[in-house]
Amino acid sequence: MGGVIPMKGYEAAYFTRGRNLVLSDTSDMCSPDWGDIYLAAKESWLLSEAGLTLYLSEGKREYLRKDCERLYLLAVNTEQKGTFLTAFDDKVSVFYFGEWLKCYFFRNGKNILDALEFSFAEYARIVSECEAFDEQLKSDCEKVGNGYYTIACASLRQSVAAHKLVETKDGKLLFLSKENNSNGCIGTADVSYPSIPLYLLYNPELVQGMLRGIYDFAKMPVWNFDFAPHDLGTYPWCSGQIYGTAQRDDKYCCGMYSTWASPRTNQMLYLRPAESEVYEKNMQMPVEECGNMLIMQAAAITAGADKSLAEENFSLLAGWVKYLEGFGLSPENQLCTDDFAGHLAGNVNLTVKALVGIEAFSLICRFLGKEELAGEYENKARTFADAFRVKVGPHILPLSYGGTDTFSIKYNILFDKLFGFSLIGQEVCEAETAYYIQKSNRFGVPLDTREDYTKADWILWAAALTDDKEKCEALYGPVVNYLAQTPSRVPFGDWYYSTRGDIVHFINRSVVGGCFAPLLKASGKCNVKR
């Protein structure tokens, strides 16, 4: 069903389902089967199949309504140049722990017709601003090196489009990602973390919008751990973390299993009491997520975001840094964000994340005027770094403690460098990146020694570690080749084989915002000493 709406100087044709079941299911690899689709121009039509055939064969535009025929939208302009608009109205964008939230544009009572009117009226200005942004981006990318602009173009819109921007009823901003093609979680902390270079560079308040949901869920009784959560549910339902739910086959856990690419509506796990024991501790990412939250919060404020969010959630941050103090130097057998590689004990990259997380907490304390505590944690970070050097020795940092002839991309060093602490040291950064170049394959350096697959976002984080432009280009150059030559013609896949160039999995994900790491470094926005 559908119709045509007369507007100011143009018309908008639309169609919709006979029954619009908003937010009726949720899963990865599933698109909404609700909402309205619009096509607008000077003249617009809703045509039956017979009407479309008449237009294509004779150029006649006539309203021909026939039941049980396919419907088509048609929009035409009679001049040589004109403007066409397409729009999708999802009615409701997100369920957020009991609140039904519309998209950000609709937050003050506006609707889809207001959006069309705004877009027509502001079209020239919007295009002009976009063109100016493109020119500036191209100029900035050329300073980074040859081919880098290609990666930026492939990353920017994909990363932004993998989020939904909404506002809670009390006016708090939420910028919620969908973990596309890797399980469909909403607001995943370790998906936000790799993406943040893009948002720190252009709008750090969006990083705060990523953090807010994790803070809110961490305060709920059902989350009874002393480390940070992984996610908020399955997009578009913030109904409680779905990752690592208990796999017991009993009457308390039935129906909690997360299934991939199977449309469903999740249970309201966020309502459950602490006694429910909903989550398996062994399937969480404790050091990973604590470090992520601390680093993201410190980076957001450093880049210019408001510090009140950190103030409101300081007790959580203080608890998470305590966890890193106790368990970060020698991580137990656990998962990290690269969970496809499985559990790993003594993960050196996780230890680096713990170190940077402790540094980040000292920064947060400094921003909040807690000078004594800031000094205390700066000293703790230095002590931690000294102990880390003793454990790893003077060689290339291994994949895990005791590992001989192993390596992994130590992307977690990045914010130690960007903040300006340099507790790891530039000598280590240069040695690591030189080694990565030696190990690089046709389409990039492998993520670690276990497999030949890699991650594009982490390669670009690594490229930002070196101050040598040629080395930076040598690291990201194979990613440019991958984008041009991969046989997997899909939206930018971030997890792929470094030798063959075909994807393993993971397409269309927000994490490619991390490809802006070299630009973020060049901006100096996260350097506290700037």
Residue ranges and their predicted role:
Residues G2-G187, P204-Q208, Y215-V222:
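Acidic/polar, glycine-enriched structural segments that form the non-catalytic walls/loops
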Residues L23-L54, K143, E179-V191, P197-P204, ...:
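Extended ligand-binding clefts on enzyme/binding-domain cores
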Residues T78, L101-V127, G184-G328, N347-F361, ...:
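Aromatic-rich carbohydrate-recognition surfaces in CAZymes
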Residues A87, E135-E142, Y193-E205, N292-S308, ...:
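Well-ordered alpha-helical scaffold segments within catalytic/enzyme domains
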Residues A115, I151, E205-F217, M285, ...:
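Extended, well-ordered alpha-helical scaffold segments
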Residues Y149, C153-A154, V160-T168, G187, ...:
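Aromatic-lined, polymer-binding surfaces characteristic
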Residues L173-S182, S276-Q284, K307-E311, E332-N349, ...:
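Active-site-adjacent structural elements in folded domains
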Residues G493-R530:
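Terminal, non-catalytic domain-edge segments
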